[in-house]
Amino acid sequence: MKKFVVERNLPGAGNLTTEELQTISQTSCEAIDELNKPYHWIQSFITSDKIYCVHIAESEEVVREHARLGKMPVHTVAEVKAIIDPLTSNPLE
């Protein structure tokens, strides 16, 4: 399985209410159930006009199928090739 970052253009996303975010979350979970394939939604980050989601799936096509089933916009899907953090700056001893 691969990790993907999904960029969704959604004007006004930063102004979504708690209830609206809950509905979006429920819709995503329902779409995952409908996929009937291995799939994990890790988390999403809401900005002013976009939502960035982290998903684990077999392929980009499966990620796009999840979006189609949930009627969610998809601007880009990018496969994560590496993850770094502050600890990356220190060589292993």
Model-derived regions, located:
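Alpha-helix C-cap/termination motif
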Residues: 34-35, 69
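An amphipathic, aromatic/His-enriched active-site/gating alpha helix that lines ligand/cofactor pockets
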Residues: 56-83
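Short, well-ordered beta-strand segments in beta-rich or mixed alpha/beta enzyme
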Residues: 6-8, 41-66
